[in-house]
Amino acid sequence: MFGVHTFKNGDSALGLSIGFRNSYDRSLSVGIAVGASVFVCDNLMLTGDLTVLRKHTSNVHTDIDGLALSAIYRSRSAFNQVKSDAEVMKQIPMSDDEAYRMLGFIYGRGIINPRMIPVVKKEWLEPSHDVFEDRNLWSFYNAVTEALKSSPPQSIMERHLAIHKQLMNHVAA
C-alpha cells in the first residue's frame, strides 16, 4: 500500500506533500516522506525532503503517529525555504534565449538527459499549467520539473535537488 497527499495553501502553487508506504505482511519497512517534492514509485521506493523509515514489527502501529508528526514538524522549515525560493524565482525575468542557454547548461551538468530537452522546451513555450505562462525563472524551473517526471525512480529526487540548487546558484550569481 502506498500513496501521496498534497496539502495546498491559499497563497502558493506549492503544497506540502506527505508520502507513505506500508505492507500488510511486514515485507517492507513503514515509510513516511514529507516535503515540497515527494515521490512514491509503484515499486515502493520512497523519497522526499525528509524520509523516515521504521522496521515493520508488531508494535509499529503505536509509533506511526509520532513518526508522521516528527517528519511534518522537521520538514516545515525546508518547505518554507522552497516557498521562499519560488517567490524569488518569480521575480527574475527570463527571455527565451536565456532559457535556452540554461537548458544547455543543465544538460551539460547532467541534470537532464537528451530525451528531456524537447519536454523542457515544449513546457517553456507552451506550459501545461497556466500559472507558469510568465517568462521568469520559476516558469523555467517548472518546465524542467515537468521533464524530470520521466527520470528513473532511483534518480528523480537527486535530479530535483540538483535543478533547485543550480537555479538558486544562478539567482545568487
Task: List each language-model region with its residue ranges.
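Intrinsically disordered, low-complexity regions enriched in serine/threonine
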Residues: 6-173
